[in-house]
C-alpha cells in the first residue's frame, strides 16, 4: 500500500472530519485538485510551503484507494507529484498526526515516515 501525504492546517482537517471528506485547502481549490506529496517529497513541501507554520497535521493516505482520480503530474521543477481530482474520502486516510515545529524551526516528522 503506497502512502501519499497531505499537510494541512489542523482546523481545516477538523472541518473535513466533521464533513466526512476533505475538499481541499484554499490552494487546492484554486488549482482544481488536492496537492499531495510522496514520502520522499513531503519534507521539502513542508519547508517550501509551510515554513514556520505551526498547528499542522500530516495525513497519510492510501494512494491505491483513490483510484483513477489520483494522477502523478510534473511540478514546475519536473518532479512528479500526486494530485487528486476530487474530494478525499476519509476512508482512504490511514493516519493523521500532528506536525509540530522543532526548536530549529523545521517541522518534526514522525519516525514512521522513514520506515
Language-model features, listed with the residues they occupy:
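Conserved, structured core segments of small domains
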Residues: 1-115
Amino acid at each position: 500500500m503506497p502512502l501519499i501525504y497531505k499537510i494541512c492546517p489542523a482546523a481545516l482537517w477538523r472541518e473535513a472530519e466533521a464533513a466526512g471528506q476533505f475538499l481541499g485547502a484554499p490552494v487546492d481549490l484554486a488549482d482544481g485538485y488536492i496537492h499531495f506529496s510522496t514520502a520522499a517529497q513531503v519534507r521539502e513541501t513542508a519547508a517550501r510551503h509551510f515554513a514556520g507554520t505551526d498547528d499542522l497535521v500530516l495525513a497519510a493516505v492510501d494512494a491505491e484507494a483513490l483510484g483513477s482520480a489520483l494522477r502523478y503530474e510534473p511540478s514546475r521543477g519536473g518532479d512528479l507529484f500526486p494530485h487528486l481530482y476530487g474530494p478525499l474520502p476519509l476512508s482512504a486516510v490511514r493516519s493523521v498526526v500532528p506536525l509540530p515545529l522543532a526548536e530549529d524551526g523545521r517541522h518534526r516528522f514522525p519516525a514512521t515516515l522513514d520506515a
